[in-house]
From Swiss-Prot:
Residues 1-164 are annotated as: Membrane-binding. GO terms for cellular component: host cell nucleus; membrane; virion membrane. This is Matrix protein 1. Pfam families: Flu_M1, Flu_M1_C. It is found in: Virion membrane; Host nucleus.
Length: 252
């Protein structure tokens, strides 16, 4: 796996699924391929994206700034600086300075990532802030190691919270989660259908699922009544994908 592929993997792991994630993935690919060369336009686009947390925007802004060549005097963006200030906690800043000194001695991506992983997310963000604000310099490879360590910490906490939701015994939360997943799967089916011969069938199945979810939410149902809904829909989607010869992994 190349360095940029690894960076893209880690960065995308902290972005919520949806159309915006696909859009960001495309921007990252363009940036890493040297196609998107106007940093000002890119940062303005990032600043106005909905849904993303300030820290996620800060990480993306840092990656774009590292990768896209820019004029020397180009102004640093306030939304990135605010996201990478470690919540203004002096403790985070002290740790960030210590981490920065260690990173200065590193020369490889993996070395930097390993060193950084022993610090908290706040300290890692503050350290990125130091580098972003030109208060310190490290090689691009080391900076990317810092980025990936930060993403790993964020993804770990997101995974813990997701696991808590999936394993919750609260039937109302489980019921709503199944309906949300059914709606998301229906949307995926509609997007995949495109103009193929089986498109009408896929759209019909997706439409029925949406109507079912809408009815269940409107009328109110017993929390166990949605148990088979998502599974049925996924089975339909996978059968449709097999006929179309599409990879299944993406929707598992």
């Amino acid at each position: 796996m190349s360095l940029l592929t690894e960076v893209e993997t880690y960065v995308l792991s902290i972005i919520p699924s949806g159309p915006l994630k696909a859009e960001i993935a495309q921007r990252l690919e363009d940036v890493f391929a040297g196609k998107n060369t106007d940093l000002e336009v890119l940062m303005e686009w990032l600043k106005t994206r909905p849904i993303l947390s300030p820290l996620t925007k800060g990480v993306l802004g840092f990656v774009f700034t590292l990768t896209v060549p820019s004029e020397r005097g180009l102004q640093r963006r306030r939304f990135v600086q605010n996201a990478l200030n470690g919540n203004g906690d002096p403790n985070n800043m002290d740790k960030a300075v210590k981490l920065y000194r260690k990173l200065k001695r590193e020369i490889t991506f993996y070395g930097a990532k390993e060193v950084a992983l022993s610090y908290s997310t706040g300290a890692l963000a503050s350290c990125m802030g130091l580098i972003y604000n030109r208060m310190g310099t490290v090689t691009t490879e080391v900076a990317f190691g810092l980025v990936c360590a930060t993403c790993e910490q964020i993804a770990d906490s997101q995974h813990r919270s997701h696991r808590q939701m999936v394993t919750t015994t609260n039937p109302l939360i489980r019921h709503e989660n199944r309906m949300v997943l059914a709606s998301t799967t229906a949307k995926a089916m509609e997007q995949m259908a495109g103009s193929s011969e089986q498109a009408a069938e896929a759209m019909e199945v997706a439409s029925q699922a949406r109507q079912m979810v809408q009815a269940m939410r409107t009328v109110g149902t017993h929390p166990s009544s949605s148990a088979g809904l998502k599974d049925d829909l996924l089975e339909n989607l996978q059968a449709y994908q097999k006929r179309m010869g599409v990879q299944l992994q993406r929707f598992k």
